[in-house]
Design a protein with these regions (language model features):
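Rhodanese-like catalytic fold shared by cysteine-dependent sulfurtransferases
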Residues: 2-9, 18-64, 72-105, 111-163, ...
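Phosphate-rich cofactor/ligand-interacting catalytic cores and adjacent structured alpha/beta frameworks
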Residues: 68
């Protein structure tokens, strides 16, 4: 009888152990799932005043990627300085375009904050850790720009078919530049006027060291009625371009 009792007790103990293990496994899965949910970054709101200060500070703006999620037409009509365009309709498919900013500050905005809120959630769900939903252009009076902004990959793809306006210092231009590039001084409009083509629809891309001088050149060119002007945000300080030396 004692042997039988011991056997029954042993089986009961084993059953309890298995049950505990089973519950522990479920608990572990629940904790893992919860941890995964917690890993999704919190989207923060950013007021127009704060964005204005960022884009007006040449050094501080280097710490932020600003993304306009409105339509290309709305973007072309006027957008926040240094903002690239990633329309909400195709936003999810183009997240890789700013993949290198996954652990840096990304501000998304639209007209009212609704579409940019959707975009912000998409970024957070894709592992972006510092996402801000910026105040919309219909809620804050921004100094909007009409020239576009692109990144290094787009510059390299389009350079051969564009008039590339290099706003770096002459010595750096002479050391190496894009084959289709011309050198200008962004502080001297006369040097820009001298290289502008007659066709106002010509694709013109400006670039420099960090996007500041080139933005000034792009704004001036756009003010002269040119309709296809783009500034590259990624300058030679951020990207090592495959330059060549030429006659220009």
């Amino acid at each position: 009888m004692k042997k039988r009792s011991f056997a029954i007790i042993a089986l009961a103990t084993l059953a309890l152990s298995l049950t505990a293990c089973g519950n522990g496994g479920s608990a572990a899965k629940t904790e893992t799932a919860a941890a995964g949910e917690q890993a999704k970054a919190e989207v923060k709101e950013m007021k127009g005043d704060a964005i204005k200060k960022i884009v007006e500070d040449k050094k501080e703006k280097e710490n932020y990627m600003i993304v306009d999620v409105r339509s290309p037409e709305e973007y072309a009509a006027g957008h926040i300085n240094f903002a690239i365009n990633m329309p909400i309709d195709t936003f999810k498919d183009n997240v890789s375009r700013i993949e290198d900013w996954k652990d840096k500050n990304v501000i998304v905005y639209c007209n009212s904050g609704k579409k940019s809120g959707e975009a912000a959630d998409i970024l957070a769900s894709n592992g972006f850790t510092k996402v801000f939903n910026g105040e919309g252009v219909k809620k804050y009076s921004y100094d909007l720009k009409t020239f576009g902004n692109i990144r290094a990959k787009e510059l390299m793809e389009k350079a051969k078919d564009a008039l590339v306006v290099d706003a770096r210092e002459a010595k750096d231009f002479e050391a190496g530049h894009f084959a289709t590039a011309v050198n200008v001084n962004s502080e001297d409009p006369a040097t820009i006027d001298a290289i502008l083509p007659d066709d106002k629809n010509t694709l013109i891309i400006t670039h420099c060291y960090s996007g500041n001088r080139s933005a000034k050149a792009a704004e001036y060119i756009a003010s002269k009625g040119y309709t296809n002007v783009w500034n590259c945000l990624d300058g030679t300080k951020e990207v090592e371009y495959a330059f060549s030396k030429g006659d220009k």
